[in-house]
């Protein structure tokens, strides 16, 4: 009857192949988008879309006469949130 350690060793041998997969998962093509013959990184488009959406959000907050504390931190966080959501949704 195998002991607990030998069962764990057998299980590790079965799943050891997945470790190299995680090590090379970042070795893919860079997500670049060709625009008029030049290649731009996809994070650049996420940042532009995020900036536009953040400015729209700012305009809505201003029109609603909402006074925010720590405005710089809030808008920076909104910019980062929108950029990550665009990246998650489209790339």
UniProtKB/Swiss-Prot annotation:
Keyword Ribonucleoprotein tagged: no
Protein name: Uncharacterized protein YtcA
Keyword Membrane found: yes
Residue spans crossing the bilayer: 36-56, 70-90
Lipidated residues (S-diacylglycerol cysteine): 27
N-palmitoyl cysteine: lipidated positions: 27
Entry keyword set: Cell membrane, Lipoprotein, Membrane, Palmitate, Signal, Transmembrane, Transmembrane helix
InterPro entries on file: YtcA
Cellular localisation: Cell membrane; Membrane
Domain of life: Bacteria
GO cellular component, as recorded: plasma membrane
Membrane-topology annotation of the record: Lipid-anchor; Multi-pass membrane protein
Signal peptide per UniProt: 1-26
Predominant cellular place of this UniProt entry's protein: membrane
Homology family: Belongs to the YtcA family.
